[in-house]
Amino acid sequence: MTIKDLYQKARIKWSSLYEGDVIHILIGTATCGRAAGSMAVLEEFKRCISNMDVPVSISEVGCMGLCSYEPLVIIIKPGNVAICYHHINEQTVPQLVERYIKNDDPCLELALGTVVGGGGEPVHIPELELFSYQQRLLMRNCGYNSPLEIDHYIACGGYSGLARALRLNPAEIIGEVEKSCLRGRGGAGYPAADKLRHCYMSPGDTKYVVCNADEGDPGAFMDRLLLESDPHSVLEGMAIAGYAIGAERGFIYVREEYPLAIHRLQTALAQAVEKGVLGSDVLGSGYKFDIEIVRGAGAFISGEETATIAAIEGRRSWPRHRPPYPSQCGLWGRPTLVNNVKTLAFFPLIISKGGDWFASIGNGKDTGTVLFALAGKLVNTGLVEVPAGTKLSTIIFDIGGGIRSGKQFKAVQIGGPSGGCLPQSLLDTPVDFDSLRQAGAIMGSGGIIVMDEDNCMVDTARYFLDFCSKESCGKCTPCRDGIHQMLGILEDFTTGQGDLSELDRLERMAEDMKQTSLCGLGKMAPNPVLTTLRYFRDEYIAHLVEKRCPARVCKELTAYYILPQKCYRGCDHCVLACPAEAITGDDNGLKVIDQAKCTKCGSCELVCPPEYNAVVRLSPVSLVPPERRSKTSL
């Protein structure tokens, strides 16, 4: 069956969503939606419509990236524009059913926007401020199409890129990718066309394509969202890559911690084979391409391409020296193309729309769009897709909505645990590979963590280095021992130990480690240390010289103190919450924290009524008046 035949049949099914007589309810059930309660919402909708006379269908869709607005529900009612509702729960479902599905009140107070522009209220979703700066290529289908329905993907142009690729020769496909100037989105930014060409030129009858979906960065979930929301875009990209290099087999290496992504990939694979877009005769062309899913154990190091190959082969995930590169000697000694999920998902768009079209997007240095996972102290967290070269300030303040609770911005950590921490003065940095590298950060897999005045940069560097120390494979000495020694120094700093000479030693160790480590983990792990030393050196000095943590985070340098003038209510909230029984009352009923007993868990600060706000953190600890350091000192 040709792609034209598949498209015509799929379009009929797709059109019924917006043009038929059935009321359609689309519920976002990606992992983020499920964490917010979307499955309970799904069951409540089923219960509420079970006795209705009018036809109603319920479908699961992926995530459109608005994770902080979940659960999201789209209701498509014949004769009305499709409306997306946010923060839906079991209590609001009956309202939507009674007021809108059964009647004509669209419940605008619950609406985020319309899916298809219709003018008036509510606003069209792409016109929302957090969307207006975005350009959605990879996420074009996410949250609107069902990942469990291949016809939805085909009806929106899916597999047309593969159909065009099959009419081209490998050199022409590689030429289109070269014109696009696409750089790999796995972190290193290597030109995608060069990888394809090297693998195509490598001699051998057996070659492989590997999709590296081992996403291990804290706070990163771009690959997971794509696999859960639009798995066919990745499968199509793998088939195009396989045809370009002469491979008949592909592997998706995905961590076991992504069960929903695995399930939806399995469903998509089965449907693709059934439709003939994968398998023994792809779209009737005679080309054969099969894909297998390999589950990983979740080690961070497995994301390094040679470690990924070792894991697929059933060996320990240890990186190896390069050359030879995987394009020369990869999986089972055969030429292998290893690409990230996002890189592969771009191939269908580049082939169907042309490399020049793709190259026109971006800032000239880098092309196309970049996918980022926004996390941390932001109003809007989730996934965003922006043209390469967009400023960090636009992503954080215009799309992310700025810092929560009126706090002050302090830093943004970009690039995962091996990325750098950049200060406010660098918020105009464009997000392209070279600009970020010049600033001391990396694009990485696309994680962005925003920090405010309550984050300690010394402790932040310690946290990321601690993560890398646990995830290091231990194969090379610079990484294994270097991280351990640097971590020890940082742990001393967070307790006020050490002197200023240690800063230079720490910097030298970090630079040596970058130069001598075997793989990217060891080479990049010092980045948080080097950038915090470069941009936040004053915080290190405060810890070492003043024995003070400016953010009042480091426990050994911080004390909890109850302000007598604010504790006039004399309640027992803090007394009851303290696990160490360190809080007692004086003769006037005012509370005192015994500093010797206090474990600095912060429970007292959490439970103190906000109208009193009597519990504060002080640093250095000498700020606590001597007469109020324990009940006996009164």
Label each PLM-derived region with a short phrase.
Residues 2-22, 38-60, 77-109, 160-177, ...:
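Ferredoxin-type iron-sulfur electron-transfer modules in oxidoreductases and energy-metabolism complexes
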Residues 26, 145-160, 211-223, 326-331, ...:
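Gly-rich Lys/Arg/Thr-decorated short loops/hinges at beta-loop-alpha junctions or inter-strand turns
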Residues 29-37, 158, 177-199, 298-310, ...:
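Conserved phosphate/anionic-ligand binding catalytic regions in large, soluble enzymes, centered on
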Residues 71-73, 478-484, 572-592, 603-621:
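Iron-sulfur cluster-binding cysteine motifs and their immediate structural context
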Residues 111-179, 333, 339-354:
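Flexible inter-domain linker/hinge segments
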Residues 130-134, 262-388, 400:
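Hydrophobic alpha-helical positions that pack around
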Residues 162-203, 358-360, 365, 373, ...:
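Accessory "access/gating" subregions that flank catalytic or transport cores
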Residues 237-241, 389-404:
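Short amphipathic, charge-patterned alpha-helical segments
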